[in-house]
Structures are given as structure tokens and as C-alpha cells.
């Protein structure tokens, strides 16, 4: 085709399953239509009338909600096992024969991030080999095994090993759960459903803080980690009964299974719409399958580095993920109880619950506005709030710690107005973080083409956890070396750099199909092209409404004329 060089794909029509004469006929017609609109003179015109009308009327089915909730159990385990360490570090006391120093606390915290990095980088290839849902089950095994090692720990080294094993599950959950949800979700609800994963993560963190309050006694931290085994075992037990992602089924030639899942996901939609949707997906997956057969894992990784349509989504995903971590949020998740203990609060774990609760609440806010407002707009609106919260927190630390050489010294009674301001500004920072970066980061795997989506999910999560290691392994050291004011000011500066990156390198994916997102990176970072396609969608939708209104009006006029004649 004349446009093949623009897209790097061949649009040969794939073979079709025996789906009955009616559906097969619809698929024949739909595929021809899809090939026509998939390679237009204007690459932004990607939808025919059936898809344009259908995607705006897609319904959220119980089946899809159930799949999202199932996958989000991994997110709950992720959140619980990263949040539980905050209270555990305070309650361990001398259970290992001595009081933990700051270096040991950093190693225990960072071990999970190290394991998560390995889990994230390996889980993408595993998901492409055994499937999305079974990779989540592998993550459950890591969650369970890690918790058992931790619960039986009687040394710092064993604790670190257990936390690293736990991290393998965290990395797997971070990479694959949002990928699975995005691939089963209707286009209209994809952003909101992926946010269910974020709600589960923050809910797990909040729950870990809640149970940390009563379990502060001797060996209470062992019970805290043991509780985290329960959701992992439950998810692993039911995974067999759930469907695979339709995209993965098609990649493995399970076309009837893929169509059955599409039918259940789009229940209530017309057969014509489902046929067009399936044909479009089938074609893109066929192209991806051809690609996968001709490329090894190493070759794919080289393509990410050398070919623009893969490199640019990788830069976008890595940038969003790295800035999410380097902003310092997880320093609060891991060390909130430690910070508030040093700041003189009587019950630091309870105060940490305010931080975690804020994060959870505003994750719900994000879910309600994500697809309506748009992910890019939300990020550009919330990053300034994050910067302001961190900058004012650094001012509060400066005023608060004047009597101790601008260092936090445990056991010091600091001025209440400044400690309260510090807490308030942390809450402001977290509110903006949870509404934007905390949620949207886990959706940017959708920016990768299907043939690279498993690798892309690993790249994203790998970048996130590499940056997380930097934060978790240096926070207490930074606080001791330069003090809290410069530390939080540094995080504010990193957020400013993140805001600039988002403005130039993050296109708006909301309202675009996963297949459309592949096209926009043929035009730089796709910021302007995404805007054009979305505007074109709105224009076409308005034209369709105008035609419908004109038809209704014409019918009404005809009826009036007939009535007048009578």
C-alpha cells in the first residue's frame, strides 16, 4: 500500500474463524472497512461511523468490572507490602537484638524496590509467553513466599532477603495488572478501570497503616506481614477461572476465546459494532504476531533503543515513571512514621494514616475525572500543586528545626504550628500527587504498540523501581546529611523538571484507542497529533449528531405537513 511506509505495517487481511454465516459476513465487511480507514490519506481519520458512534455509547459491564477487580488484587498486595514497612520499621524495635540504624532501615526498604526492579523487567517477557493472568499468579507466589521469609526472620539479613522476594511480586503486579486491565477494558472506560489498580494500591497502603496502629507490640510486625499473604492466595486460587486478555488470546491463535471475551466485554452493543471492533483488533494483533515471530527478546530491546516508534513511547513512559518516583512520594510511604516520630508527634503511625488516607481518597477523585478531563491536562494541572506543597513543606521544616541546626532530632519538642504546617503541606502534596501522577503513571504502558506492550510494561515498571531504589536508599541519608529543608526543596525542583517533560513529551491518550496511540508517535512525541485526532473525533461526532437531528427534524416536518393536509 502507498501508506505502508508511514506506518511500518502490512495490512494483509487475516484469516477468520468460523463464527457463523452472519458474523463471518459482518467480519468480512468490517475488515474491509477497517483496512480502508486504517490507512487514510489523513492518518488521524481512524474510525468509521460504526466505531465512532459505538465507542461513545460503550457500556460498563459487570464482567469487565469483575476482571478489573480481580487484577487489582495484585495492586492491593503491592500497596500493602510497600506500605506496611512504615509501621514495621517503628515496631521492630530491638527484635533483631538491637535498634535498627538508618542504614539498616534504608536497606530493608530498598530491598523491595530492588526485587521489584527484577520482577518488573522479567514479567513482561513472561506475560508474552504464558499470558497476563498466569503472570499475575506468579506474582502471587512471590508475595506469599516473601511474606513467609519475613515473618520467620530473626536477623536483618533474612529480613532484607524476604523483602527482596516480596519485591519480585510487587514488580510483577506493577507491570502486568494495569496491562491486563487496559487490554480487557472498553476504550471509553479504559482510564477509569486502570485507575481501579491505583485505588487498590493506595487502599492496600491505607489498610497496612490501619493494622499497624494496634500491632506495635513485640513481634507485631510479623503479624502485619502475615496478613498480606491472604489476598495473594485468594487471587492465585481463582485465576484459572478467568479469561485471558483478548489481545493475548489472538496472539496465541485462540480466536474463538478472544471473540467470546469481546462479546462479554461489550455486552449490549450491536453485533455490527462488535464485528468491527474484533476485526480491527484481529488485524493489529496479526501484525504483532508476525512481528513477534521474527524478533527475539534481544532484538526487541534493540528496537526500543533505535527505532522511533518504539523509542519515543519508551522515553515517555520512562520519564513519567521516573519523575513519579523522584518527586519523593514514596519517601513518605516508607518513612512517614519515622519522620513524624522525629518531628515529635506522639503517635507517628496514626499521623501517617492521615497521609495514606489522603492518598487513597484522592485516588477515587482521579478515577472520577480521569477520562472526562484527560490525563495530560490532569498532570499539567496537578504538578504545580505538588511543587507548591513540597516547597511550603521545606519552609515549614526550616522554621520548625531552627533550634536544632535545621536537622530533625528525635526526642525534640518542635513548635506545634510549624509541625502542623509541615503535615498540612505534605497532605497538599499527596492530594495533588494522587489525583495525577500517582494514578496516571500506571496507565502509560498503553503508549506502546501491542507487539511491544509486554516489553513496554517491563520498561516502565523497571524505570519506576530503579528510581524508587534511589529514593528509598537515600532518603534518611539525605535528611541527615543536608537536612529536611534542602531535601524537600530538591524534590520540588524535580517536580518542576517533570512538569516541563510532560508538556513536551506526553501526548493525551484519553479518547484514543490503543491502536490509534500507535500512530501518533509517527509525528514526534505525538502531542500535536493527538490533539488533532481528538479534535477530529469531536468534529465527526458533531456531524453525526447534526445528521441525526436533521433526520429527526425532517421526519417531524413531514409529519406536520401531513397533519396540515388532514
UniProtKB/Swiss-Prot annotation:
Ranges per topology, Cytoplasmic: 1-64, 128-140, 185-192, 244-313, 371-377, 443-458, 507-566
Gene Ontology annotations for the cellular component aspect, listed alphabetically: plasma membrane
InterPro entries, A to Z: MFS_dom, MFS_sugar_transport-like, MFS_trans_sf, Myo-inositol_Transporter, Sugar/inositol_transpt, Sugar_transporter_CS
Protein name: Myo-inositol transporter 1A
Subcellular location: Cell membrane
Region (Disordered): 546-566
Swiss-Prot/TrEMBL induction comment: Expressed during growth on inositol and during sexual reproduction. Expressed during infection.
Gene3D superfamilies, per the entry: MFS general substrate transporter like domains
Keyword terms of this UniProt record: Cell membrane, Membrane, Transmembrane, Transmembrane helix, Transport
Species assigned in the record: Cryptococcus neoformans var. grubii serotype A (strain H99 / ATCC 208821 / CBS 10515 / FGSC 9487)
Function: Major transporter for myo-inositol. Plays a role in the traversal of the host blood-brain barrier.
Record-annotated membrane-spanning stretches: 65-85, 107-127, 141-161, 164-184, 193-213, 223-243, 314-334, 350-370, 378-398, 422-442, 459-479, 486-506
Catalytic activity: myo-inositol(out) + H(+)(out) = myo-inositol(in) + H(+)(in)
GO biological process: myo-inositol import across plasma membrane; symbiont-mediated migration across host transepithelium
Record field: compositional bias (Polar residues): 556-566
Coiled coil regions, renumbered to chain: none
Topology class, membrane: Multi-pass membrane protein
Ranges in the topological domain labelled Extracellular: 86-106, 162-163, 214-222, 335-349, 399-421, 480-485
Record-linked Pfam families: Sugar_tr
Phenotype of gene-disrupted mutants: Simultaneous disruption of INO1 lowers hyphal density and leads to a severe sporulation defect and attenuated virulence in a murine inhalation model of systemic infection. Simultaneous disruption of ITR1A results in defective mating hyphae, reduces production of phosphatidylinositol and glucuronoxylomannan, reduces laccase activity, and increases expression of ITR1, ITR2, ITR3, ITR3A, ITR3B, ITR5 and ITR6.
Source domain of life: Eukaryota
GO MF annotation, one: myo-inositol:proton symporter activity
Amino acid at each position: 500500500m502507498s501508506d505502508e511506509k508511514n506506518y511500518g505495517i502490512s495490512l494483509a487481511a487475516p484469516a477468520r474463524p468460523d463464527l457463523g454465516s452472519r458474523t463471518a459476513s459482518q467480519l468480512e465487511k468490517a475488515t474491509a472497512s477497517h483496512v480502508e480507514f486504517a490507512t487514510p490519506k489523513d492518518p488521524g481519520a481512524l474510525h468509521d461511523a460504526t466505531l465512532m458512534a459505538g465507542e461513545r455509547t460503550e457500556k460498563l459491564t459487570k464482567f469487565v468490572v469483575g476482571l478489573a477487580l480481580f487484577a487489582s488484587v495484585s495492586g492491593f498486595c503491592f500497596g500493602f507490602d510497600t506500605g506496611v514497612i512504615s509501621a514495621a520499621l517503628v515496631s521492630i524495635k530491638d527484635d533483631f537484638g538491637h535498634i535498627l540504624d538508618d542504614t539498616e532501615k534504608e536497606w530493608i526498604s530498598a530491598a523491595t524496590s530492588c526485587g521489584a526492579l527484577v520482577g518488573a523487567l522479567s514479567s513482561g517477557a513472561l506475560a508474552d509467553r504464558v499470558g497476563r493472568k498466569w503472570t499475575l499468579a506468579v506474582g502471587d507466589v512471590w508475595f506469599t513466599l516473601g511474606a513467609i521469609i519475613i515473618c520467620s526472620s530473626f536477623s536483618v539479613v533474612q529480613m532484607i532477603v524476604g523483602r527482596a522476594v516480596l519485591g519480585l511480586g510487587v514488580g510483577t503486579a506493577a507491570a502486568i495488572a494495569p496491562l491486563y486491565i487496559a487490554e480487557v477494558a472498553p476504550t471509553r472506560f479504559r482510564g477509569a478501570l486502570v485507575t481501579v489498580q491505583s485505588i487498590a494500591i493506595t487502599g492496600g497502603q491505607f489498610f497496612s497503616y490501619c493494622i499497624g496502629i494496634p500491632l506495635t507490640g513485640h513481634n507485631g510486625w510479623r503479624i502485619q506481614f502475615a496478613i498480606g499473604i491472604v489476598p495473594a492466595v485468594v487471587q492465585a486460587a481463582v485465576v484459572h477461572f478467568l479469561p485471558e486478555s483478548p489481545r493475548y488470546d489472538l496472539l496465541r491463535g485462540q480466536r474463538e476465546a478472544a471473540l467470546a471475551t469481546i462479546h462479554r466485554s461489550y455486552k449490549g452493543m450491536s453485533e455490527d459494532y462488535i464485528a468491527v471492533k474484533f476485526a480491527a483488533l484481529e488485524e493489529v494483533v496479526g501484525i504483532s504476531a508476525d512481528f513477534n515471530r521474527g524478533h527475539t527478546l534481544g532484538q526487541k530491546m534493540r528496537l526500543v533503543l533505535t527505532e522511533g516508534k518504539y523509542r519515543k513511547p519508551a522515553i515517555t513512559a520512562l520519564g513519567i515513571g521516573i519523575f513519579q518516583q523522584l518527586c519523593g512520594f514514596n519517601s513518605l510511604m516508607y518513612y512517614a512514621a519515622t519522620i513524624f516520630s522525629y518531628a515529635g508527634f506522639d503517635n507517628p503511625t496514626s499521623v501517617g494514616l492521615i497521609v495514606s488516607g489522603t492518598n487513597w481518597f484522592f485516588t477515587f477523585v482521579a478515577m472520577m475525572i480521569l477520562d472526562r478531563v484527560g490525563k495530560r491536562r490532569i498532570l499539567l494541572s496537578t504538578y504545580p500543586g505538588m511543587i507548591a506543597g513540597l516547597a511550603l513543606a521545606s519552609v515549614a521544616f526550616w522554621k520548625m528545626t531552627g533550634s536544632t541546626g535545621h536537622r530533625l532530632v528525635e526526642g525534640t519538642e518542635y513548635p506545634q504550628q510549624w509541625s502542623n504546617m509541615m503535615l498540612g503541606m505534605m497532605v497538599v502534596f499527596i492530594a495533588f500527587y494522587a489525583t495525577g501522577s500517582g494514578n496516571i503513571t500506571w496507565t502509560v504502558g498503553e503508549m506502546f504498540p501491542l507487539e511491544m506492550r509486554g516489553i513496554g510494561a517491563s520498561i516502565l515498571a523497571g524505570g519506576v523501581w530503579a528510581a524508587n531504589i534511589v529514593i528509598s536508599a537515600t532518603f534518611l541519608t539525605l535528611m541527615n546529611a543536608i537536612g529536611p529543608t534542602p531535601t524537600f526543596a530538591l524534590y520540588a525542583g524535580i517536580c518542576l523538571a517533570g512538569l516541563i517533560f510532560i508538556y513536551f513529551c506526553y501526548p493525551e491518550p484519553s479518547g484514543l484507542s490503543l491502536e490509534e496511540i500507535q500512530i501518533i508517535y509517527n509525528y514526534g512525541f505525538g502531542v500535536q497529533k493527538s490533539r488533532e485526532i481528538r479534535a477530529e473525533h469531536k468534529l465527526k461526532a458533531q456531524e453525526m449528531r447534526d445528521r441525526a437531528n436533521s433526520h429527526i427534524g425532517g421526519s417531524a416536518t413531514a409529519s406536520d405537513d401531513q397533519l396540515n393536509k388532514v
